[in-house]
Amino acid sequence: MHSRILLLLLMFAFNVGLINCGQSLVSPQSNCKIRCENGGMCVFDLERPDFHSCICLLGVYTGDRCQIRIAPEDIETTATSDETSHPMNIQHQQSQADIDDARRRDDERKREYERQVAERTRKEKEDRERASDEERRRQQHEQYWKEETARREQQRAEAERRIQEQRVRDDERRRQHEAERSQIEERRREEESRRLAAQRETDEARVRDEERRRQETEKEVEKELNDKRTQSMNEQFEYEGGDEEYPQVAEKEDEYDEGYETDNTEDVTITTTKTTKLMKPMVEESKGVDGDDGSDMIMEKDEMEDDKEPIRKEDEKLIDSIKHVFNKAVDETVKEHPIEEDEYWDETSKKTDEDSWTAENEGTKKTEEADEYGMEEGTEGWMMVKKENENAAVGTTVSLITVTFLFTLIF
């Protein structure tokens, strides 16, 4: 019994010595990477801290985890007996061989374990490196996304700022455009008002000018009519009575019989003929005014107004004033020089000479062409109008002046 206690103490001392030779206990034992059985202690190598192994009680248990128990007889024989040729020694020698095999197997298992530990360590290192790489990539990715998010946010803010600035510029430009347009509209209204005022002034001036011209025309026509009336009254024949009233007519008739025609006669004939043709409607109109109730004149006037273009009010006023002056002049002329009183009978006998008769007929034809009231054959001789040419000249002059004013004002 005492020998066993001593053996255990020796084994403990031996184990302590082994532990102190480059190894150390794992503390706490629960951190051991392998499970030691039968009271084995877990130790780690100082040079390789990741390598763990089990220290068994010497002579009691063996194996990489202290799982093999050593027989007690072998232990007692080894501790108490000497080396003899006793059969027990042979058994002891055989047990030592088994122990060597067990140690060899332990070494192999230890090497395998070390290899596994190294492989596991390598894998763990690779895993750590892989995890580190992944963490680094993750951090880089997170940093990239942070930077990208910040950049996009900055771009969005910049775009929003540009949009706001563009909107402000557009509003300012729109306000300027509205202000310019309002100014242009105001200037246009002012110009339009000035133009209308100038047009009104021009129209008023034109109306005043036309009124002045109309008054001047009326005055000139009245003055000219008065002059012509005075001239006609001065040139009127004064008859003393009896047979002495016809010498001038006889002389004039002799001139026509002789075929004597001057240039003045031709001019008067042509002018009188043209003027008579132009004034014939006016004379007929004046006769219609004196003879009937004016219905034909109104109808003819309506037809003429339908055929012609519309006349301005100023021209109508001027034409009405001229017509009034013209009608007044015709009435005055007819009153002062009645046609019935100017007729007389030619008591001279007819000439028998065919040449004289031919010349007389030619003169009569010219006189008839020139005057509407020509010579007419009566029961006692030829009837002539004494004042017809003078009246026609006065009426022709008045009509010509009136027509000239009318055409000048209308066209």
Swiss-Prot record:
The keyword Aminoacyl-tRNA synthetase does not apply. Disulfide bonds join 32-42, 36-54, 56-66. Residues 28-67 form the EGF-like domain. Residues 267-276 have a biased composition (Low complexity). The keyword Signal applies. Residues 237-266 have a biased composition (Acidic residues). SUPFAM superfamilies: EGF/Laminin (SSF57196). It comes from Caenorhabditis elegans. Residues 100-230 have a biased composition (Basic and acidic residues). This is Uncharacterized protein T05G5.1. Keywords: Disulfide bond, EGF-like domain, Signal. Residues 1-21 form the signal peptide. InterPro entries: EGF-like_dom. Residues 78-97 have a biased composition (Polar residues). Gene3D superfamilies: Laminin. Residues 78-312, 337-375 are annotated as: Disordered.
